[in-house]
């Protein structure tokens, strides 16, 4: 084995599925949001052989000898029967989940010997998938690391910040590292070899269905099963159920049995539902209230209106416009679709597709054989869809494979090895002797005698027991809701700022008007904040000049350094980002993440500081460093490297080397020395419409 650069699990699928002969060619539809392409067997083989280094560009033609030679190389590498033909076994191997690094030839590499030079490796779980409870995800990652610590001197310690060696992230599509995911059943995950910055990090595609390899894991609340997960399928009144149901209840609250036979065992719990609670937000875990009013319109279900990140939310009072209380709706992972253009939404049955009614998931219209459903009653009209739940991918096994790459391992050519390119589910011990030889070549054996790695995931995931009253039948309604939001949930917006804004200035005699140049200026919580050497003033524009301060920055944001370069607040999530040198701090209310290095955002070493930020709406922000800028995604907290632009071209008339770039009252300000240039965007054209003094014209200081 040899270390290589990022390792990407890929699921390639054929353009046609096995089916009985039909009198006519089946209709294949282009589904909105679907990145899969329909390929013939030969096209698939040519693309596969080229992508993984078995053929060259010039050979991608009708040259049968080149194709046969490439197939033999592939078959030899993957320990397949060496026929040189595009046979069934070879095609199945090409369809299987696997890493995307070439098997032959060179790939872009990082510098160094690509191993860690310390034995205590730290890791940080930056965010979570909604497919599994957080404690189950924590456990899966811990067991995946234990696979490698069992046979080496390495130890793995969880930390809670970006200083970690290995940062674990769930993301979708373009997530900031230049290796985008491509939706359901495409790229599963990738990892980078050991080293600084992004090296060592592991990313997982959040459009996949993450399970323990045997179907969805649905935690229960209340009932009489002490929080045990649902058991699918289960029997109720002689009928089999493979998802949560509202049958037997008059309040339409979904429930499930936690054993295979409710009729015999009578053990049950309630499935995640907005009827029980809404998570995160500022609604204190209370259930959704339907109908509720938002922007004058009545809503009787959860909605994504008003949000650009696709999260479903609801009001926890009857009038959001008045009370501003909300939460995010729990995802029904037992029935929620993945991928497509409606991830997280449940299937709607029956639905209309090409004029025909469907009451179950179908393969019709697809060339890859995957089951799908509409998430509205009429696909022909609404074009809303997703893939139906399946067994999913074992987060434990995929993580163990990816962490092998994060430790410096390349792929194995032994089919039984964990580091073999293709993913396969197993409940046995994941490590093969080839894996052990590879990792011990890098780090040596564990000093204890003959340790054994973990053998299998637990039969039941750890869960949090419900605090509600026990009940005896699913026909009975729970008498109390949960006391707070569940552990799992989106990372979306708490709306509250710090618990208390300071009201008493440090030194009221310290006049803001005597400051010539500020360290940073930013609009935060509807006030324009002026930062200088560990202090700040708040300014609001109204009748007369209204300035409060100075206040000590650590009294509001304790982790911040004395000198700031820039800051901004995201209007959707209410997260506040502070930049100083090559570091960034992210505050959500009183909670902070950081300092993080700028390279974790995707900004290279040439970016020595972030000199300003302009929110663009929709969770996007322009980050500036002198004469360059990049588009920053607040949700993934990464920049799009392809978005780099020139300030001179985008904002003509603005001087060189500006600082304190900020947005105020929907206009952009570029400061240089004591002056500012205000930019107004009319008809998508940026024009300087005002030049003035920061103190005299913005702060309305008197001219002495």
From Swiss-Prot:
<keyword id="KW-0177">Collagen degradation</keyword>
<feature type="region of interest" description="Disordered">
    <location>
        <begin position="434"/>
        <end position="507"/>
    </location>
</feature>
<dbReference type="InterPro" id="IPR036365">
    <property type="entry name" value="PGBD-like_sf"/>
</dbReference>
<keyword id="KW-0732">Signal</keyword>
<dbReference type="InterPro" id="IPR024079">
    <property type="entry name" value="MetalloPept_cat_dom_sf"/>
</dbReference>
<feature type="compositionally biased region" description="Pro residues">
    <location>
        <begin position="483"/>
        <end position="496"/>
    </location>
</feature>
<keyword id="KW-0482">Metalloprotease</keyword>
<feature type="binding site" description="in inhibited form">
    <location>
        <position position="99"/>
    </location>
    <ligand>
        <name>Zn(2+) 2</name>
    </ligand>
</feature>
<feature type="disulfide bond">
    <location>
        <begin position="361"/>
        <end position="388"/>
    </location>
</feature>
<feature type="repeat" description="Hemopexin 2">
    <location>
        <begin position="561"/>
        <end position="605"/>
    </location>
</feature>
<keyword id="KW-0862">Zinc</keyword>
<feature type="binding site">
    <location>
        <position position="206"/>
    </location>
    <ligand>
        <name>Ca(2+) 1</name>
    </ligand>
</feature>
<feature type="binding site">
    <location>
        <position position="401"/>
    </location>
    <ligand>
        <name>Zn(2+) 2</name>
    </ligand>
</feature>
<feature type="binding site">
    <location>
        <position position="201"/>
    </location>
    <ligand>
        <name>Ca(2+) 2</name>
    </ligand>
</feature>
<dbReference type="InterPro" id="IPR001818">
    <property type="entry name" value="Pept_M10_metallopeptidase"/>
</dbReference>
<feature type="disulfide bond">
    <location>
        <begin position="244"/>
        <end position="271"/>
    </location>
</feature>
<feature type="binding site">
    <location>
        <position position="182"/>
    </location>
    <ligand>
        <name>Ca(2+) 3</name>
    </ligand>
</feature>
<keyword id="KW-1015">Disulfide bond</keyword>
<dbReference type="InterPro" id="IPR036943">
    <property type="entry name" value="FN_type2_sf"/>
</dbReference>
<dbReference type="InterPro" id="IPR006970">
    <property type="entry name" value="PT"/>
</dbReference>
<dbReference type="GO" id="GO:0030198">
    <property type="term" value="P:extracellular matrix organization"/>
</dbReference>
<dbReference type="Pfam" id="PF04886">
    <property type="entry name" value="PT"/>
</dbReference>
<comment type="subunit">
    <text>Exists as monomer or homodimer; disulfide-linked. Also exists as heterodimer with LCN2. Macrophages and transformed cell lines produce only the monomeric form. Interacts with ECM1.</text>
</comment>
<feature type="domain" description="Fibronectin type-II 1">
    <location>
        <begin position="225"/>
        <end position="273"/>
    </location>
</feature>
<dbReference type="GO" id="GO:0004222">
    <property type="term" value="F:metalloendopeptidase activity"/>
</dbReference>
<keyword id="KW-0272">Extracellular matrix</keyword>
<comment type="function">
    <text>Matrix metalloproteinase that plays an essential role in local proteolysis of the extracellular matrix and in leukocyte migration. Could play a role in bone osteoclastic resorption. Cleaves KiSS1 at a Gly-|-Leu bond. Cleaves NINJ1 to generate the Secreted ninjurin-1 form. Cleaves type IV and type V collagen into large C-terminal three quarter fragments and shorter N-terminal one quarter fragments. Degrades fibronectin but not laminin or Pz-peptide.</text>
</comment>
<dbReference type="InterPro" id="IPR033739">
    <property type="entry name" value="M10A_MMP"/>
</dbReference>
<dbReference type="InterPro" id="IPR000562">
    <property type="entry name" value="FN_type2_dom"/>
</dbReference>
<dbReference type="InterPro" id="IPR006026">
    <property type="entry name" value="Peptidase_Metallo"/>
</dbReference>
<protein>
    <recommendedName>
        <fullName>Matrix metalloproteinase-9</fullName>
        <ecNumber>3.4.24.35</ecNumber>
    </recommendedName>
</protein>
<feature type="repeat" description="Hemopexin 3">
    <location>
        <begin position="607"/>
        <end position="654"/>
    </location>
</feature>
<dbReference type="GO" id="GO:0006508">
    <property type="term" value="P:proteolysis"/>
</dbReference>
<feature type="binding site">
    <location>
        <position position="131"/>
    </location>
    <ligand>
        <name>Ca(2+) 1</name>
    </ligand>
</feature>
<feature type="binding site">
    <location>
        <position position="208"/>
    </location>
    <ligand>
        <name>Ca(2+) 3</name>
    </ligand>
</feature>
<dbReference type="GO" id="GO:0031012">
    <property type="term" value="C:extracellular matrix"/>
</dbReference>
<dbReference type="Pfam" id="PF00045">
    <property type="entry name" value="Hemopexin"/>
</dbReference>
<feature type="short sequence motif" description="Cysteine switch">
    <location>
        <begin position="97"/>
        <end position="104"/>
    </location>
</feature>
<feature type="disulfide bond">
    <location>
        <begin position="302"/>
        <end position="329"/>
    </location>
</feature>
<feature type="disulfide bond">
    <location>
        <begin position="513"/>
        <end position="701"/>
    </location>
</feature>
<dbReference type="GO" id="GO:0030574">
    <property type="term" value="P:collagen catabolic process"/>
</dbReference>
<dbReference type="InterPro" id="IPR018487">
    <property type="entry name" value="Hemopexin-like_repeat"/>
</dbReference>
